[in-house]
Each structure stands twice: as structure tokens, then as C-alpha cells.
Amino acid sequence: MPAGILKSGANVNAWSFNIRIVEIEIALRLGRAVTPAEALTLTVESGRALVDALTVSIELVDSRWLQAGAAQPLLKLADMQSHGALVLGDWVPYSAEFLGHDWTRQSASLQIGHQPAVNFVGSHTLQDPTWLIPIWLRHATSQGQTVSAGTVVTTGSWCGMPLAQKGDLVVADFAGIGRTTVQL
């Protein structure tokens, strides 16, 4: 996998982060390549048909500023959302059961360190994380590039952006989909 993309169970304790913000997400994998011409014709339904698998992911958001959260507001605005790492769980086939999945009832939980787990139900802002596939593919192909089969698309946080600390074990669990962990 590319640097910064890890498998569930990874230990990033030795990594240098300026801040450790956690997002739990559903990651989608494209089953085949998509050309710029095809991307222009996609609907939500045809976009869903491109997905061959999904997994639980944990995105670690970092900051380029040493002072991280204490940086001036405009500096934070320019910087927050810097990629620290992406941790992917086991891939689950995107089968017919997910085509009719009611994402507004999807439950997920996040546990950070020794804090109690926090539960979320239907908390994804798009309600259906596959909704963004056509829009994202039009953007990704807008300069004439074909998006490769196997490309992974993360779809946004189900938990907001809570902070974690060095040494914390982060556990993300999505009912019926899977579980992903990372040791900070």
C-alpha cells in the first residue's frame, strides 16, 4: 500500500503527529477504471455499480503547524484536514444487500483509549456515502485522467473530529460491515 495507508491493527506510535484528530469513515473501492467520458454520464445508481467493496476506515488528521489547534484561525483554516494516515479494515463485497441499505439506520461506534465508546446512528452528512461517487469521479477525471480500478474513496466522518492522544488505541466499529483499529 502507499505510504500513509495502513491495514487495521497498525501501530503508529513512533510516527510524529502535531495533532491526532480521528474520523471514522466508510471507504469504497472502485471495481474498474473510469474514464473522463464515462464520469460525465454517471448517475448515483451507475456510480454505485462501480463500487466492488467497502470497509471501515480510520482517518488520522494532522496539522502542519507545530502549535496545531493553537494556530491563528486563518492558519488553521488553511491547514486543518492535513492527511496524517488512513487505516483500512477488511474489505467486504459491495453486494446487493448494500444497494438497499438504509444508511440512516447504520450504527457505528468509536472508542479512543480508555474513554467509553461513543455510538452514532445515521450520522453521515450525506446519509448514503455512495452518493458522492459520480461527483467525485467527475472532479477526479476533469483534467483528462482515467481513475484506476482499485482506487479507494473515503466518504466523510461519522463521528465529527474528536481528538486522540499518543498511546491511545482507536477502535471503529460499523455494525454489519466491520471493525478497524489503530494504535497511536
Located regions from the model:
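Glycine-centered tight beta-turn/hairpin loop motif at sheet-sheet or coil-to-beta transitions
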Residues: 114-115, 175-177
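Short, charged beta-turn/beta-strand-edge "cap" motif at the junction between a beta-strand
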Residues: 159-162, 176-179
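Catalytic-core "active-site belt" of small-molecule-metabolizing enzymes
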Residues: 1-127, 169, 184
